[in-house]
C-alpha cells in the first residue's frame, strides 16, 4: 500500500518546479523590458542634451543675431526662429533649407542673417530626425520622439549700457535653449521650460532638457 500512495509524487514535484520556473522567467522578462525602457529614456535624454549644446555653440558663434537684429534690414533672430509658442521640430525650416530657400552656409559665404537662418534650418532637421535615415525607405530614425526645440531670453544686462557717446562696451544676454520630447511613462510635469507644453497629451509625459548659455554683445 505505501508504494501505491507514493505513485505520481515525482510528477507533482516536476510540475511545481515548472510553475516556479515559469514565474521566475516571467519576472526576468519583465525586468529586461523595464531595463530597455529605462535605457531608451536615457538615450533620449542624451540626444536632447547634445541637440541643446549644438544650438548653444551655434548662437555663441553668431551672437549678434541672438535676440535682436542689428541696424539694417529685418531678419530672423534665433529667439524669433524658435519661440515657445511655435517651437522648431516640424521640419518646415529644414524643408526650406533642402529646397534652397535657406542658403547653405557650409558651401557659400553667408551674412550673419543668412547664417542664423542656416543654423535654425539645420537644427530643425536634427530635431525632426533627418540626421539618420533608413536606407531604401528614407524613414527618419535619427531623432528623438516628437522632439521640439525652443530658444528664449531669460535675462540681460543691457540696462547697464552707458548712453552715447560713451565708449563702446559689452552687455550680457542669458539664453535658454530647451529641447522637449515625449517620454514613455508618466512622471512629474517638468518646470524648467514651457517648451512643448500641450504637444504630448498629459504634461506628465513631457520630458525637457534646458541649457542656459551666456552671450555678450556690444552696447547699442
Spans of features found by a protein language model:
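Aliphatic-rich helix starts adjacent to a transmembrane/signal segment
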Residues: 2-53, 62-63
Amino acid at each position: 500500500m505505501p508504494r501505491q500512495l507514493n505513485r505520481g509524487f515525482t510528477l507533482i514535484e516536476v510540475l511545481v518546479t515548472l510553475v516556479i520556473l515559469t514565474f521566475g522567467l516571467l519576472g526576468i522578462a519583465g525586468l529586461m523590458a523595464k531595463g530597455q525602457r529605462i535605457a531608451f529614456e536615457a538615450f533620449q535624454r542624451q540626444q536632447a542634451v547634445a541637440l541643446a549644446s549644438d544650438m548653444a555653440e551655434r548662437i555663441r558663434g553668431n551672437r549678434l543675431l541672438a535676440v535682436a537684429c542689428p541696424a539694417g534690414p529685418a531678419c530672423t533672430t534665433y529667439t524669433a526662429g524658435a519661440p515657445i509658442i511655435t517651437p522648431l521640430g516640424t521640419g518646415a525650416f529644414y524643408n526650406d533649407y533642402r529646397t534652397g530657400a535657406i542658403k547653405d552656409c557650409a558651401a557659400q559665404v553667408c551674412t550673419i542673417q543668412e547664417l542664423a537662418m542656416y543654423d535654425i534650418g539645420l537644427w530643425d532637421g536634427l530635431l525632426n530626425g533627418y540626421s539618420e535615415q533608413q536606407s531604401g525607405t528614407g524613414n527618419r530614425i535619427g531623432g528623438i520622439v516628437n522632439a521640439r526645440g525652443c530658444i528664449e531670453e531669460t535675462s540681460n544686462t543691457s540696462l547697464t549700457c552707458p548712453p552715447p557717446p560713451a565708449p563702446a562696451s559689452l552687455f550680457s544676454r542669458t539664453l535658454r535653449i530647451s529641447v522637449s520630447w515625449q517620454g514613455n511613462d508618466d512622471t512629474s510635469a517638468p518646470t524648467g521650460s514651457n517648451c512643448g507644453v500641450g504637444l504630448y497629451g498629459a504634461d506628465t509625459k513631457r520630458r525637457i532638457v534646458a541649457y542656459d548659455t551666456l552671450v555678450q554683445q556690444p552696447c547699442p
